[in-house]
Design a protein with these regions (language model features):
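Single, functionally critical "micro-switch" positions that shape active/binding sites
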Residues: 7, 227, 310
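AAA+ P-loop NTPase catalytic core and its hallmark functional loops
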Residues: 17, 27-29, 37-284, 292
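Hydrophobic transmembrane alpha-helix bundles
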Residues: 31, 148-156, 179, 224-230, ...
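Alpha-helical lid/collar subdomain of P-loop NTPases
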Residues: 37-79, 96, 263-264, 272-371
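DNA-binding alpha-helical recognition surfaces that contact promoter or target DNA
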Residues: 14, 125, 317
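Charged low-complexity interaction tracts in eukaryotic proteins
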Residues: 4-19, 23-35
Length: 371
């Protein structure tokens, strides 16, 4: 057995791979719990997490550095379902407060914002510091109603093949102290969204029709979602595959936080935390210029000059690639410029020239070449 009390030799198989740990397998169309080997909670529900309800409280000011007297419930024990802590992570004040309120008061929270702004990572890093088990499910077009609820499966028991119901990720999660995060929430299929809608109710009970069973929500269950749009469809052309969300369902989310592009200095701080080799006077000036390029790309996108926008994730990748290639210009071309439409590349190259005071070699003007 592992240190958490879980059997490490369980023979459980899934479609795409392990979701977390040796007990739960999450794959496309298949979920399995080894019911013969997992410990039972006091109420008879199989507990594969290793913890029950939060057993301590933490100070938000001490742990997150936010100017508030708020305290939040947390777990003393750290299990394998808890995300790893990123000690250099920079928290956005409003988004972090919303996430902490969701954990403290069981509020269902959707975090909306542009790509690469750290929506899912914010939730993960808050959960990591609370020792709160967390599972992320990507609502791509292959996630179906059966995946979420479960299905009958043929299993081998006492040497005989029998049909047994295997729970999906949703009924499993709501019976455990888990933060369940639905990524790409606005890309979910309509039939999948209506499965989730019942769990969004105030009492959060879920009925399994195949089992004639009503599942009650565990006191430690929390529900989150991340989305690029706010359920009204995509008007930017950036997010193909997203769709409008039923407004009756949107109304059930208790909180909606918006995490878009951050102030210049805050974004510089985040990039420096991820690329510490730039943490010197010259490096800080370089990173500040990188963020200015990103600011220009966003202004150009809003004005309709370009159709590709540079996210904070892109800036971090640019900084990392520049270290690899030893050249900021090469890093820019490899990270962002080559992703842009050919007709827009001269404009994107001009952003670089305006911020760094030099032109990219392949985009030098005739005048500058003559000079």
């Amino acid at each position: 057995s592992s240190s958490s009390g879980f059997p490490t030799d369980s023979k459980i198989y899934g479609g795409l791979g392990w979701l977390a740990g040796p007990v739960l397998v999450f794959g496309r169309g298949r979920y399995a719990l080894d019911r013969r080997r997992t410990p039972l909670a006091d109420d008879g529900i199989i507990n594969t997490i290793g913890v029950d309800l939060p057993d301590t409280e933490i100070s938000v000011k001490d742990v997150f550095g936010l100017d508030t007297d708020m305290t939040v419930p947390a777990f003393k024990k750290r299990t394998e379902y808890v995300p790893e802590i990123d000690p250099s992570y920079c928290f956005d004040h409003d988004t972090t407060i919303a996430i902490l309120a969701s954990f403290a008061h069981s509020r269902k929270l959707m975090v909306q914002g542009y790509h690469g702004t750290g929506k899912s990572t914010h939730i993960e890093q808050v959960a990591a510091r609370l020792n709160w088990p967390l599972i992320r499910v990507n609502l791509d077009s292959h996630i179906s109603r059966i995946d979420l609820i479960g299905k009958d499966a043929i299993v081998l028991k006492d040497g005989k093949q029998i049909t047994e119901f295997r729970e999906g990720i949703l009924p499993w999660a709501i019976q455990h102290p888990v933060a369940l995060v639905f990524d790409e929430y606005d890309a979910g299929r309509p039939d999948v969204m209506f499965v989730i809608q019942r769990v969004l109710e105030a009492d959060g009970k879920m009925t399994l029709l195949d089992q004639n069973k009503v599942i009650h929500t565990h006191g430690g269950f929390r529900l989150f979602a991340t989305a690029n749009t706010v359920g009204l469809g995509d008007t930017t052309g950036l997010y193909h595959g997203t769709q409008q969300i039923n407004q009756a369902q949107m109304d059930r989310w208790n909180l909606v936080a918006t995490l878009n592009y951050l102030p210049h200095e805050k974004e510089v701080e985040i990039v420096l935390s991820k690329a510490p080799s730039y943490n010197n006077k010259a490096g800080k000036e370089t990173v500040s210029s990188m963020v200015r390029v990103a600011d220009l790309s966003r202004a150009g996108f809003m004005a309709g000059d370009i159709s590709t926008v540079m996210s904070p994730r892109t800036v971090i990748t640019w900084a990392e690639n520049s270290v690899i290639f030893g050249d900021v210009a090469v890093g820019y071309r490899m990270t962002f410029l080559n992703k842009c439409d050919e007709l827009e590349r001269s404009t994107v190259a001009e952003y670089y020239q305006r911020c760094f005071g030099e032109e990219l070699p392949e985009y030098k003007t005739v005048a500058s070449t003559a000079a």
